[in-house]
Swiss-Prot record:
This is Phosphatidylserine decarboxylase proenzyme. It is an enzyme of class 4 (lyase). HAMAP family: PS_decarb_PSD_B_type1 (MF_00662). One of its GO terms (molecular function) is phosphatidylserine decarboxylase activity. The record marks G247, S248 as: Cleavage (non-hydrolytic). GO terms for cellular component: plasma membrane. InterPro entries: PS_Dcarbxylase (IPR003817), PSD-B (IPR033177), PSD_type1_pro (IPR033178). GO terms for biological process: phosphatidylethanolamine biosynthetic process. Keywords: Cell membrane, Decarboxylase, Lipid biosynthesis, Lipid metabolism, Lyase, Membrane, Phospholipid biosynthesis, Phospholipid metabolism, Pyruvate, Zymogen. The keyword tRNA processing does not apply. It comes from Azoarcus sp. (strain BH72). Catalyzes the formation of phosphatidylethanolamine (PtdEtn) from phosphatidylserine (PtdSer). It is a peripheral membrane protein. The active site is at D88, H145, S248.
Amino acid sequence: MSDRLAVLPQYLLPKQRLTLFMGRLAGARAGSLTTAVIRWFIARYGVDMSEAENPDPAAYASFNEFFTRPLRAGARPLAQADFICPVDGAISQFGAIERDQIFQAKGHRYTTTALLGGDRELATHFDHGHFATLYLSPRDYHRIHMPCAGRLTRMIHVPGELFSVNPTTARGVPGLFARNERVVCVFDGEHGPFVMVLVGATIVGSMATVWHGVVNSPRPGMIRDWRYPEGQVVLGQGEEMGRFLLGSTVVMLFPQDCLRFNAEWAPEKAIRLGEKMGDLFSCTPQAV
């Protein structure tokens, strides 16, 4: 079956209603029933609970608490690198941005402007730059950390579709990551601006940041834009910046000639938080 045919049912599903319903279930505190669901999920997806701060499934009052569980201390040491992997997951795609075109999958590209909610002025900072698209599967740790130190300047919530973001859907839905609901976080770092985009998906109840909390509840039909004064939110490399309540994808953008990716990186390669993502190449810092 072709990827386009495989994703056809997703066009017909009431994705918003399904996601709202599942989000409410995931937040429910149902005692032994919640624990049973968590145990089933651990067995179904092979979740390694030995890495969790609390490995006991019964310790989590809701499925959301389990899904966003913290890791035990020392579980993810940080590599000595200018840029580290911000998540556990797998590399969907990465590489050069061809002017403003980001590669999604064979036969599919989308623009930085579309990804950033139509803000062409912001997108120009990343023309001919670099991108990385990282997929978090259900079994993965679902907190998102900083690839490098940065000062938050903007956050943009872009409403949209809620297609699945698994590899099959990425191959079958044109412009997937610029169509789905997303939260765009804009930072200034030592090397210049960079962007982390948290992309929503079917059954992703919500996306949250450490400075705001849940961003997309309720889900308004308009773009929302927050600006942050200098020094209000500053995060170091490896610090938590956000989390998914049920998993999804992170897309990162970097300016031209700033980032040299880890030579061992390849599409579909499994990655872990704290591993080397790349090193600083050479660029002239410019504020957004």
